[in-house]
Amino acid sequence: MSMTLHWSPRSPFVRKVMVFAHETGLAGRITTIRTVVAMTRPNHDLLAENPIGKIPTLRLEDGSVLYDSGVICEYLDTLHGGPRLIPAEGPARWVELRRHTLATGLLDILILWRNERDRAQPSQVLFEAFELKTRSALAALEHEIDRIPFGLAQITLGILGSYLDFRFADLDWRQGHPRLAAFHAKFEKRPSMQATQVVDA
């Protein structure tokens, strides 16, 4: 019996889980279900498993359910026999989780920004706030990238760069962030990234 993941080919959070699963050798134990979600159109089938109606949502082999990409990755990290991708304890754990939260928080901002762009009357004030926070987060990540080991935070950073290319090519995010750009150019060649490429469909 396999685990079942509510999945979309465009969600960076779903992709985080799938890249993590590939990197830990667990992708073959996950069956994906294409699940359409939108802020204005709740998915009632998904709500039956996740009361907030968000993806990724993972149904485990025993029928219980986990949601939030970070929580799901923490769970997957307990299932494989290789090196842990999230430190289990000590200062390294908190540094890893902080870096992961920074990258994930920027993804949250980008999704809100994209939704605002799609409104009939978008707010310029929000646009300016989103751009300021994006530039601030990218600067912080540029400062830290060379010290971030392979793990959950680095995976999330790889996905972040790809999502910026997919949805915000006009930001030219590589400009002024040469270390992030070099990291992403290398990271996106990993088999796990190639196996989970974004499909705009």
Q: Which ranges hold each PLM region?
A:
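Short, surface-exposed recognition loops or helix-turn segments adjacent to catalytic cores
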Residues: A88-P91, P149-L152, T156, V198-A201
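GST-like domain detector, emphasizing the conserved glutathione-binding G-site
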Residues: M1-V125
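Short coil/loop linkers at secondary-structure junctions
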Residues: A27, P83, D172-R174, Q194
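Residue-level signal for nonpolar/aromatic packing positions in well-ordered secondary structure
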Residues: L58, I155, F187-R190
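Non-transmembrane alpha-helical segments in soluble domains
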Residues: C73, D77, L97-H100, L138, ...
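Generic structural signal for secondary-structure transition and capping sites
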Residues: G81, D108, D146, S192-M193
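GST-like fold's C-terminal all-alpha helical module
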Residues: A103-A185
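Charged phosphate-binding loop/patch that engages nucleotide di/tri-phosphates or the phosphate backbone
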Residues: R179-V198
